[in-house]
Amino acid sequence: MKNKVKELRARFGYSQEKLGETVGVTRQTVAAIEKGDYVPSLLLALKICKAFSMKMEDVFWLEEEN
């Protein structure tokens, strides 16, 4: 799964720690999501989208398989 979390976080002026506090996870979890090492639960993805006032499909999308 791909995402724009890092890009949006920078645009909104959030640190990884601040976004983590906002959505209820650690800074390390935010970093892992940004790197694509961790796929968030639906609830967490919705919280992240709400923090940025964006729709799910504008933040997260499936990577096309070859």
UniProtKB/Swiss-Prot annotation:
Residues 5-59 form the HTH cro/C1-type domain. PROSITE patterns: HTH_CROC1 (PS50943). SMART domains: HTH_XRE. GO terms for molecular function: DNA binding. Residues 16-35 bind DNA. Keywords: DNA-binding, Transcription, Transcription regulation. This is Uncharacterized HTH-type transcriptional regulator YgzD.
